[in-house]
From Swiss-Prot:
Residue window of motif NPF 1: 386-388
Protein name: Target of Myb protein 1
Subunit composition and interactions: Interacts (via GAT domain) with ubiquitin. Interacts with eps15 and chcA. Interacts with tsg101 (via UEV domain).
Function: May contribute to the sorting of ubiquitinated proteins and transfer them for further sorting/trafficking processes to the endosomal multivesicular bodies (MVBs) pathway. Binds to phospholipids, such as phosphatidylinositol PtdIns(3)P and PtdIns(3,5)P2. These phospholipids are involved in the recruitment of the ESCRT machinery to endosomal membranes.
Record's keyword annotation contains Transmembrane helix: no
Species this chain originates from: Dictyostelium discoideum
Localisation per UniProt entry: Cytoplasm; Membrane
Motif NPF 3 positions after renumbering to this chain: 528-530
Domain named VHS: residues: 9-136
Gene3D superfamilies registered for this protein in UniProt: 1.20.58.160, 1.25.40.90
Interaction with chcA: annotated segments: 351-356
Domain GAT: 194-284
Lineage: Eukaryota, Amoebozoa, Evosea, Eumycetozoa, Dictyostelia
Disruption phenotype: Cells show no change in the morphology of endocytic compartments.
Length: 663
């Protein structure tokens, strides 16, 4: 709150001093002296502002000094007094601000001339006076301040200002008591009179003031802009410090000072020496700047750092040599150990301390070069390794020779992307054919076991002539759909048997190859699964029953032998549609959750009820390809309640067993 009042009293928009705000601040400080430091600090900041604000701040400081005695200690500090000296010595300061500052310094110096508890006022006044500055004449109506006497006898003569002035006479009852150092005459160590002690204190305070100002001037001096030897104020301060140093030495060597003053003189002597050394350093920097052609001087290279670097390099070389000697067996440390009679482990410990383990290698090692040249090889782990398995002989032992034979082909323009001619039979085709052949043999054995009870007259019995095996040996069967077909001269195997179709004509040793399938006719009954008329190769059970009742004997006597037609031999594109009505429609034989019976149950029922049905139904059915043969429709009673759809087997099979071997 008090700082806000200070800002209000020093507002640059004010035409004249706001005495109401000034008196309000004074009343607050008299009630609560704790705010005195903050107020003085805020006024010190205002001295760095514009000229109008500086004038208002000086007027506020003068009024607070006269009305509030708690501010004397803070105004006498070095920070505030240094700002006053800066305003006076700065060439850019306006004339009215400089005259007002000189007037305040003179009045405060005379008012606190005999006050050694606050020596800052008189030190600043004496310094400015010795510096040659002329103080402006005092106005006739200016108040005369006197704070030198004791609080009981202190009087302040005041005059009432008529033009834009206010009475600044403080009441004597509110004056605080201060201990006067000069009134104590019994503290003199030499037993001198009381008049000699105030003179010494006055000299010490003046020397302190001049030394502090000299330090401030040198610290703010820019060597590139101004020469310290050409500045008159710095010259005068330098001479004053020289004389003060001589005087301080005399006072220390006299022995007439007490212990308290002796400590003060010793500290003062140190401050003077530091100020003189700084002055000499400024002169040297200015001289180097002029010699460099009025250009900034780069920082000098420190010779000590260079010497230290050289010493470190020498030590490292010595360490490397000693390390190499230790490896060769010729150590030089053993002799020193014997002479000094020190244990060997101490020398080894010292050597380890001297070795720089973080130093980069001097040369390139051949191991690093070899490691960079070699490609990165990721370590491979065998996840399928079985330690209990017996070692097996390697099959492809001639692989390096094959690689050597393939290299010239690659050099002569071998292109891996171009499809190369394949062999006659791939390994994959042979594997599929062998597996299919083994499945057929197993299925045939199962069929023989199921059909042996029906006798030799059973047309569904599997004869030994239909087997593909020759002399009991299993030969690989190569399908027609393989990538590479065998030549024409090679004997073709017998096609896969369809139990529901007549035996096709055998063409062993002939040059006839299966032709292409017939064209697909989309508008025929063969391709329409929703047509009511049955297709040629899918006769339903109802029609079969009717035909069996009308012509049971003609089927046995007038059964023509169907000749092999190569046109339908390789017909893999013949459509065969599933019987959607058979799913869930069979109420009599609903043993399968999909509405169909097992294949063996169907076969047994067909053999008991309709043994010769297959010849009439499959009279016009074309034979399928050698590789993909589809099963004929299941023979079931016509129980379809949906009507219009033919009952046929949903899943194509190769044989009677019901196991699908299609790939």
């Amino acid at each position: 709150m008090v700082t806000e009042l200070v800002d209000k009293a020093t507002n640059e928009l004010l035409i004249q001093t706001d005495w109401t705000t000034v008196l309000q601040i004074s009343d607050i400080l008299n009630r609560d002296p704790i705010h005195a430091r903050g107020v003085v600090r805020q006024v010190t900041k205002k001295l760095k502002d514009r000229s109008r604000v500086i004038l208002l701040a000086l007027e506020l400081a003068d009024s607070l000094l006269q009305n509030c005695h708690c501010t004397h200690v803070y105004f006498a500090e070095r920070t505030f007094q240094t700002e006053l000296c800066r305003l006076i010595m700065n060439k850019k300061t306006k004339l009215n601000v400089k005259e007002k500052t000189l007037e305040i310094v003179e009045s405060w110096g005379n008012a606190f001339q005999a006050r050694h508890d606050v020596p800052g006022f008189y030190e600043t006044y004496s310094f400015i006076k010795r510096s040659g500055y002329k103080f402006p004449p005092k106005p006739s109506d200016a108040p005369i301040l006197n704070f030198n006497n004791s609080p009981a006898k202190r009087t302040v003569s005041t005059t009432i200002l008529t033009n834009n002035s206010h009475s600044t006479t403080p009441p004597q009852a509110n004056v605080p008591s201060f201990n006067n150092v000069s009134s104590v005459g019994s503290n003199n160590a030499g037993g001198g009179g009381s008049s000699s002690q105030p003179i010494k204190n006055q000299e010490i305070s003046s020397i302190k003031g001049s030394t502090s100002v000299f330090n401030e001037m040198i610290s703010f001096l820019n060597v590139e802009d101004e020469d310290p030897q050409e500045n008159d104020l710095i010259k005068e301060l330098f001479e004053t410090c020289k004389q003060s140093q001589i005087r301080v030495k005399e006072m220390i060597e006299s022995g007439s000072t007490n212990e308290r003053d002796l400590n003060v003189l010793l500290k003062l002597n140190d401050e003077i020496n530091n100020a003189l050394n700084d002055h000499e350093a400024c002169i040297k920097r200015r001289r180097a700047f002029v010699e460099n052609g009025y250009k900034p001087v780069p920082p000098p290279q420190q010779q000590q750092q260079q010497q230290q670097q050289q010493q470190q390099q020498q030590q490292q070389q010595q360490q490397q040599q000693s390390h190499s000697n230790n490896h060769n067996g010729t150590t030089t440390t053993t002799t020193t150990n014997n002479n000094n009679k020190n244990p060997s482990y101490l020398t080894k410990h010292k050597e380890l301390e001297e070795i720089d383990f973080f130093k980069a290698p001097d040369g390139i090692s051949p191991y690093s070069v070899q490691q960079q040249l070699q490609p990165f090889q990721q370590q491979q782990f065998n996840s399928t390794y079985n330690p209990f398995a017996q070692p097996q002989p390697q099959q492809f032992q001639q692989q390096p020779q094959q690689q050597l034979q393939q290299q010239p082909q690659q050099q002569q323009g071998f292109n891996q992307r171009i499809q190369q001619p394949q062999q006659q039979a791939d390994a994959f085709d042979l594997f599929v054919a062998n597996r299919q052949q083994s499945n057929n043999n197993n299925n045939n054995n199962n069929i023989n076991n199921t059909t042996s009870s029906f006798g030799a007259n059973n047309p569904f019995a599997n004869n030994s002539s239909n087997n593909n095996n020759t002399n009991g040996a299993i030969q690989p069967y190569i399908p027609n759909t393989a990538k590479s077909l065998p030549p024409v001269s090679q004997q073709l195997q017998q096609p896969m048997q369809n139990q529901f179709s007549p035996q096709p004509q055998k063409f062993v040793g002939s040059s006839i190859t299966p032709s292409a399938p017939p064209p697909f006719k989309p508008n025929t009954t063969q391709s329409n699964p929703f047509n009511t008329s049955p297709p040629l190769n899918n006769m339903n059970n109802h029609n079969n029953n009717m035909m069996q009742q009308q012509q049971p004997q003609q089927q046995q006597q007038q059964q023509p032998q169907q000749q092999f037609n190569p046109m339908y031999n390789n017909n893999a594109m013949a459509p065969s549609y599933p019987n959607y009505n058979a799913i869930g429609a069979d109420n009599q034989h609903n043993t399968n959750p999909y509405g169909m019976m097992n294949h063996q149950q169907q076969q047994q029922q067909q053999q008991q009820q309709q043994p010769m049905m297959n010849q009439m139904n499959n009279f016009s059915a074309p034979t399928y390809s050698q590789f993909t043969n589809y099963a004929q429709p299941n023979q079931q009673p016509y129980n379809n309640n949906y009507g219009g759809m033919n009952q046929s087997n949903m899943y194509p099979n190769n044989n009677m067993s019901g196991k699908s071997s299609l790939i």
